[in-house]
């Protein structure tokens, strides 16, 4: 099994963690933006099937 020879520096650890967090926050912003456009009906890339409501006589 591969074992690292030296300890990873704290600055490198922080840089990697910040990149990981930034990637997650960008994905969250993108998902929220898509949800907003779908809910307002302004989405051009998503088609939401509308259900027809049948009235009973």
Swiss-Prot record:
One of its GO terms (molecular function) is structural constituent of ribosome. Keywords: Chloroplast, Plastid, Ribonucleoprotein, Ribosomal protein. The keyword Plastid applies. Transmembrane segments: none annotated. It is found in: Plastid, Chloroplast. Belongs to the bacterial ribosomal protein bL32 family. This is Large ribosomal subunit protein bL32c. Its main location: plastid. It comes from the Eukaryota. The gene is rpl32. InterPro entries: Ribosomal_bL32, Ribosomal_bL32_plant/cyanobact, Ribosomal_zn-bd. One of its GO terms (cellular component) is large ribosomal subunit. GO terms for biological process: translation.
